[in-house]
């Protein structure tokens, strides 16, 4: 028995277009799709909904290998269900990343709780703990902690691209469309999905402003750098095909000419130029990190950077603030040179 994810067109506004079904019969996996419907009604972003669907598809395939069905019965759930699922993923070859394992376990946990609210906790009790909640007035009453069934995620130290790397990578592009995309990531800090979701009316060149739909469909307005304004203007006047679509960035050639540029197309574009220039770390998210680091070097405040990047929590912004060892050395040298405290000298 095999399962896969399909996208269906439905007039029902309360039904998710993404469905997990049996491959041979097309029968839906009810408990999974009911959870997807709930998240769809909550207006979960399309990319997040797709991630949930494929995470649950992986769980269903694992469950079917043990129980010979994709349907989950409340009596089959035990306190070690998700722990067993986590162990299965950890033993997989090639290994899954820690963040992938954690995301899949978390989604399966929520979907099972949604379907069986009175069933035994599918997370082992040993992973539950009480903690004292810290509030504005100090420590409050004990509360049950969230599930600690998580694989430790190694801390990544993403070093921003150097000026030379950015220049070499950018010199490989030939169209204003591609340069405008790079400019929006490097000078505005946009995510890949934010760039691809831009429409023509989101660009206000006369006011040098850009309207961006971020995660959770949250809107924010960003100032446009003069270089980005020039590239966008050139692309819209001279390169963009005269098509009826509202999309800003469209395919420029081939059968898909005039249709909205896809994530696969964007990845292919960056992959090609990485191979051409030898800049192996040049990817959309690395440009976003470079944007944050450049603004920090320029003296921007963290609250302002948080607004520009579309973060809801400043702790998320702090993870993007990475400076190079050369920056640390230069700032240290500058600080030491400004010291007025005399240093002890050896006695003669």
Predicted regions, residues:
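N-terminal core-binding DNA-recognition domain of tyrosine recombinases/integrases
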Residues: 32-48, 56-144
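Active-site/catalytic core of tyrosine-dependent DNA strand-transfer enzymes
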Residues: 226-279
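Catalytic-site neighborhood detector that most strongly recognizes the C-terminal catalytic loop/helix
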Residues: 309, 314-334
